[in-house]
Curated annotation (Swiss-Prot):
Belongs to the oxidoreductase OpS7 family. GO terms for molecular function: oxidoreductase activity. The gene is yanE. It is an enzyme of class 1 (oxidoreductase). Pathway: Secondary metabolite biosynthesis; terpenoid biosynthesis. Part of the gene cluster that mediates the biosynthesis of yanuthone D, a fungal isoprenoid epoxycyclohexenone that acts as an antibiotic against fungi and bacteria. The first step of the pathway is the synthesis of 6-methylsalicylic acid (6-MSA) by the polyketide synthase yanA. 6-MSA is then converted to m-cresol by the decarboxylase yanB. The cytochrome P450 monooxygenase yanC then catalyzes the oxidation of m-cresol to toluquinol. One of its GO terms (biological process) is terpenoid biosynthetic process. InterPro entries: RmlC-like_jellyroll, RmlC_Cupin_sf. This is Probable oxidoreductase yanE. It comes from Aspergillus niger (strain ATCC 1015 / CBS 113.46 / FGSC A1144 / LSHB Ac4 / NCTC 3858a / NRRL 328 / USDA 3528.7). It comes from the Eukaryota.
């Protein structure tokens, strides 16, 4: 295992489309009482979601200790597992609120895998001093997943815990683990933030983060992560990927001659 090295530069992309079009997320003007508002389109028949459907797997169950999360289906069928109980949602059901510390995960409703799911997702502002699920978290989590799964590599648990902790999100241990939320919280902080920070795992990467200054502000608040708050890193990364893109274009031109 080793800290990830981004292979793509997607900072500033809006909408952000990942996994061969399996999901597309656009930033919307947020209401005054919300941390963010995203318009998402999930296509369960494509990319990573098609692989999950084929194997019967789901995205990781998780919880947020300091934020309410909200889902509203605009088109299609969405399932939200709430503490292990699947709740099927359609456009007729209105907005669904998921309280803090609720173990949950969303996915296209089984039996409707070929349908596109259009939905809104938002969350309340974080509590003072707490990490938050926000745009920076989603950009890095999706960026990391795409780099890993599109190349058939194994996911690094420390990297996931580092990103989740910085995004106010924690993996849910199995249902039979006593005090599972507290266990998940401790694992995220100790392994993701503390140990991960010492081993070189940053929670945010300039290649994927649109508001890099905001990410640096967040990392500077942690002794274990402040060394990753390099405000000039994004410009260097942009120039690096521009050079690589130019070299790729030249190589293609020479090959076609």
């Amino acid at each position: 295992m080793a800290p990830c090295k981004p292979r793509t530069f997607t900072a500033g992309e809006d909408p952000l489309t990942k996994f061969d079009g399996a999901i597309s997320v656009a930033t919307m003007p947020r209401p005054a009482d919300r941390q963010f508002l995203f318009h998402g389109i999930m296509r369960p028949s494509r990319g990573i979601y098609a692989k999950l459907v084929a194997t019967g797997k789901k995205p990781p169950t998780h919880f947020h200790p300091s934020q309410w999360e909200f889902f509203r289906v605009l088109r299609g069928n969405l399932t939200v597992d709430i503490n292990g109980v699947p709740v099927h949602r359609t456009v007729d059901d209105g907005e669904m609120a998921v309280p803090p510390y609720t173990h949950h995960v969303i996915y296209g409703t089984p039996g409707t895998e070929m349908n596109e799911v259009e939905f809104l997702v938002s969350a309340t502002d974080e509590e003072e001093g707490a990490t938050a699920m926000d745009q920076e978290f989603f950009e890095n989590w999706y960026g990391y997943q795409e780099d890993i799964f599109q190349r058939g590599e194994k996911i690094d648990l420390i990297q996931v815990l580092a990103m989740f902790d910085a995004g106010g999100t924690y993996l849910s241990p199995p249902w039979w683990v006593p005090f599972r939320a507290w266990v998940g919280l401790i694992l995220g902080i100790v392994i993701g933030r503390w140990i991960g920070g010492l081993l070189g795992y940053a929670p945010f990467y300039p290649e994927w983060t649109t508001n890099w200054d905001a990410a640096c502000d967040r990392m500077e608040q942690s002794w274990f992560q402040r060394r990753y708050a390099d405000r000039g890193a994004q410009q260097r990364a942009r120039e690096k990927f521009q050079v690589q893109k130019g070299q790729g274009t030249v190589a293609k031109g020479e090959k076609s001659e």
